[in-house]
């Protein structure tokens, strides 16, 4: 199976001298195409820092991140920004929806801003899969938290990225809604052949992943 993402001795250090702190220490990670991987750790363990480097949002102190064998931090800043827009999808705890435009516009907005052709049939299928096709004309503030997160998931899927990163995607949701959103997220990723990496502190979410990475005090280990 093709390797989509891998790292080599990835490190992130804050401070210097006696105040030096390793947020991430010599992380070696490999994720295959189509996998649902979970990175689990307690608050402050370094998991969000790790995600930001994997997604090209923050530079490492040392080490490498390869997306489809391309060393992303060797790219020029403009080229890295293009890669993030076109090859990486992000889902965050806070939804990050634009309050002044409707569901459909929120989903297709990133592609429109990037000048990409919008596959209308594909987007409609995603909205149907996530059971929000009847909300396309609704504004985000009229939706429940679970529905808003489904819109965020649809937005990440719509551009057909190589990989999707979800940072505590159920952090603002109740348990029942969280379970529904995670099940939909996994099902959607499988249906559309997406590779999914979820950052979480929730063991229940991690247990349904294909591969689990555990981060503690910046050190990353694999559980399967």
Per-range role (PLM):
Residues 4-215:
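ABC family nucleotide-binding domain
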């Amino acid at each position: 199976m093709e390797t989509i993402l891998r790292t080599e001795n990835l490190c992130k250090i804050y401070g210097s001298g006696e105040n030096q702190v390793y947020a991430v220490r010599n992380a070696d990670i490999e994720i295959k195409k189509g996998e649902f991987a979970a990175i689990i750790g307690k608050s402050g363990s370094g998991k969000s820092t790790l995600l930001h480097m994997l997604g090209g949002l923050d530079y490492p102190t040392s080490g490498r991140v390869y997306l489809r064998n391309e060393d992303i931090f060797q790219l020029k800043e403009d080229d890295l920004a293009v890669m993030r827009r076109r090859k990486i999808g992000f889902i965050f705890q806070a939804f990050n929806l634009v309050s002044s435009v409707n569901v459909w516009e929120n989903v297709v907005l990133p592609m429109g801003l990037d000048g990409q052709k919008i596959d209308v049939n594909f987007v409609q299928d995603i909205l149907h899969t996530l059971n929000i096709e009847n909300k396309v004309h609704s504004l985000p503030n009229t939706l429940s938290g679970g529905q808003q997160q489904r819109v965020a998931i649809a937005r990440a899927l719509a551009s057909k990225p190589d990989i999707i990163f979800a940072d505590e995607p159920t952090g603002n949701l109740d348990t029942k809604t969280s379970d529904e959103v995670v099940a939909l997220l996994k099902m959607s990723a499988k249906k559309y052949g997406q590779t999914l990496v979820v950052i979480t502190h929730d063991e229940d979410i991690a247990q349904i992943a294909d591969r689990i990475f555990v981060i503690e005090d910046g050190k990353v280990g694999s559980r399967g």
